[in-house]
Design a protein with these regions (language model features):
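Canonical Rossmann dinucleotide-binding motif of NAD(H)/NADP(H)-dependent dehydrogenases/reductases
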Residues: 2-33
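The beta1-alpha1 cofactor-binding region of Rossmann-like NAD(H)/NADP(H)-dependent oxidoreductases
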Residues: 40-41, 61-72, 104
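A glycine-rich helix->loop->beta "capping" turn
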Residues: 55-56, 76-89, 95
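Substrate-binding pocket helix/loop in short-chain dehydrogenase/reductase
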Residues: 98-99, 103-108
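Active-site loop immediately N-terminal to the catalytic Tyr-X3-Lys motif
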Residues: 99-100, 147-153, 169
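Active-site helix of classical SDR
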Residues: 122, 158
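Residue(s) in the substrate-gating loop at a strand-loop-helix junction
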Residues: 142
Length: 181
């Protein structure tokens, strides 16, 4: 997709970092935005950055690991924007700890956000994106999806999983008018 003007993008983790910068960049190109983050204050800061962009912006405070919240957000996006052309599954967390040093709850937290959040975002938005006639699913991973690092076992595992999920999804959608990266 080369032209973002009047397209609609959903972005997870839009309250800071890469997600916030994606929102700013896409808005400058005339793309309407549906933004989500677990941090309402971060979302408000992103909206402030977009005030002069002249695009529609909706926000949803949610945890990407909450399947029902993701379903509601997808429906809300279509209700407010009419359609959706792309999703940036960007939300992620890290924990600098060895496997032995991390609790089960911390390990599950990383997996639920970094992997299942991507799956839920894809599953809920993909039918809507395909319906738009042209679209794209963009799953943000990291270099840790290519190489492992000590004290990042859980994070590495989720990023390798996202990479595998994305490559498989790309093959599944190869014959349809929907890109995956």
């Amino acid at each position: 997709m080369k032209n973002f003007k009047n397209k609609v993008a959903a972005i997870t983790g839009a309250g800071s970092g890469i997600g916030q910068q994606l929102a700013v960049l896409l808005a400058k190109q005339g793309c309407h935005l549906s933004l989500s983050d677990v941090n309402a204050q971060g979302l408000a800061q992103t909206v402030e950055l977009l005030e002069k962009s002249n695009v529609r912006v909706t926000t949803q405070k949610l945890d990407v690991a909450d399947r029902d919240a993701m379903k509601l957000w997808a429906a809300d996006t279509v209700q407010h924007h009419g359609s959706v052309n792309m999703i940036f599954n960007n939300a992620g967390v890290a924990l600098g700890s060895t496997v032995e040093g991390a609790s089960y709850e911390e390990l599950e937290w990383i997996v639920n956000i970094n992997f299942w959040g991507v799956v839920y975002g894809t599953k809920e938005f993909l039918p809507l994106i395909k319906k738009s006639g042209e679209g794209h699913v963009i799953n943000i991973s990291s270099l840790f999806g290519l190489t492992a690092q000590p004290t990042q076992s859980a994070y590495n595992a989720t990023k390798f999983a996202v990479r595998g999920f994305t490559e498989s999804l790309r093959q599944e959608l190869d014959i349809e008018n929907c890109g995956v990266s």
